[in-house]
Amino acid sequence: MNITTISHLRKYKQRQQKFAAITAYDAAFASLFEQNGIQVMLVGDSLGMTIQGNDSTLPVTLEDMIYHTRCVRRGAPYCLLIADLPFMCYATLYQAYDNAAALMRAGANIVKLEGGGCWVTKIVRCLTDRAVPVCCHLGLTPQSVNILGGYKIQGRDKDSADRILSESIALELAGAQMLVLECVPITLSERIADVLTIPVIGIGAGPVTDGQILVMQDILGITGNRIPSFAKNFLTDSRDIPTAIQLYVQEVETGKFPAVQHYFS
C-alpha cells in the first residue's frame, strides 16, 4: 500500500477523478477504513458531538485532538491525515504555530482551520511559510455556530456566495493546500471547484467537488434518527461495515453519491 499525499489529490483533480474521505477517531476504525479504500481521513473536532456527546464542537480541546490523531495514525499509517485545530486554538499566530506543530507531531499531514477572513488568511500564509500544510473550511463552519445562529446552509444569497468564493481564492493564494466546503448550494460549489487549483472536498455541497467527506457515524447509521439530509447510511444496503465503506468509496468515485436528495440547489 502506498502513502497518500496531497500531490496524489492534486493529480486526481487534474484527471477529474473523485475520491472519498471520512472522519476517524480511533485506531480500529481507521485501520478498517484504510483497508477498504479510504485514502483521506479527518480527525475532526466533530468528535465533540459524535464521541463526547456534546451539542457542538466548541468543548473540544487541543489535547483531545492530539490523542485521537495519534490513535488514527497508528491505525492508518498510509492515509493522508487531516486534523482539526479546535475552537480558539488559532486565535493568534503564535498559538497557531504551537498547536499546529503539536498536531503534526501527533501524526497529522495537514491541519484544518475554519473561516476565511483576513486574519485566517494571514494564519494560513504564516503556517505554510513554516512548512505546515493547511486545509481550510468554508461554508457552514461549526465553530461559528453561535454567530451563524445554528447549523444552516450558507451562501444562498449573492452577497454571501460572492464572499465565500472570494475567501476561497484568497486562501489558495495564501498557500492553502485543500478546502472543505460544507452545506452550500451546488451552484456555488461548482464555481469554487472550477476556479481553484487545489482539491475541494464537499460535505453537503453536491457532486461537483473533487472529493466527498462524511462523518463515519452517519455512513454507518449509528447516529439514531439524526442523520443529516446530505448524508447516507451505507450500512443499510451492506452486509457488514467493510462492505459499507467499499460501497461509499465506489459511489463517490462513480459519481452516484451524492445524489440529488443529498445536496442543496
UniProtKB/Swiss-Prot annotation:
Binding-site list for Mg(2+): D45, D84, E114
Q: In which pathway does it act?
A: Cofactor biosynthesis; (R)-pantothenate biosynthesis; (R)-pantoate from 3-methyl-2-oxobutanoate: step 1/2
**Cofactor(s) required, per the database record:** Mg(2+)
Q: In which domain of life is the source organism classified?
A: Bacteria
Q: Which residues bind 3-methyl-2-oxobutanoate?
A: D45, S46, D84, K112
The alphabetized UniProt keywords are: Cytoplasm, Magnesium, Metal-binding, Pantothenate biosynthesis, Transferase
The note describing how and how many cofactors are bound reads: Binds 1 Mg(2+) ion per subunit.
Active-site residues (renumbered):
E182 (proton acceptor)
This entry carries the following GO cellular component terms, namely: cytoplasm
Catalytically driven reaction(s): 3-methyl-2-oxobutanoate + (6R)-5,10-methylene-5,6,7,8-tetrahydrofolate + H2O = 2-dehydropantoate + (6S)-5,6,7,8-tetrahydrofolate
Entry keyword annotation includes NAD: no
Q: What GO MF terms are annotated?
A: 3-methyl-2-oxobutanoate hydroxymethyltransferase activity; magnesium ion binding
Q: What is its EC number?
A: 2.1.2.11
Can the keyword Cytoplasm be found in this entry's annotation?
yes
What is its subcellular localisation? Cytoplasm
Q: Which GO terms describe its biological process?
A: pantothenate biosynthetic process
Pfam families (UniProt xref)? Pantoate_transf
**So what family is this one in?**
Belongs to the PanB family.
Its biological purpose is as follows: Catalyzes the reversible reaction in which hydroxymethyl group from 5,10-methylenetetrahydrofolate is transferred onto alpha-ketoisovalerate to form ketopantoate.
- Subunit arrangement? Homodecamer; pentamer of dimers.
This protein is called 3-methyl-2-oxobutanoate hydroxymethyltransferase
Q: Which organism is it from?
A: Baumannia cicadellinicola subsp. Homalodisca coagulata
Originating gene:
panB
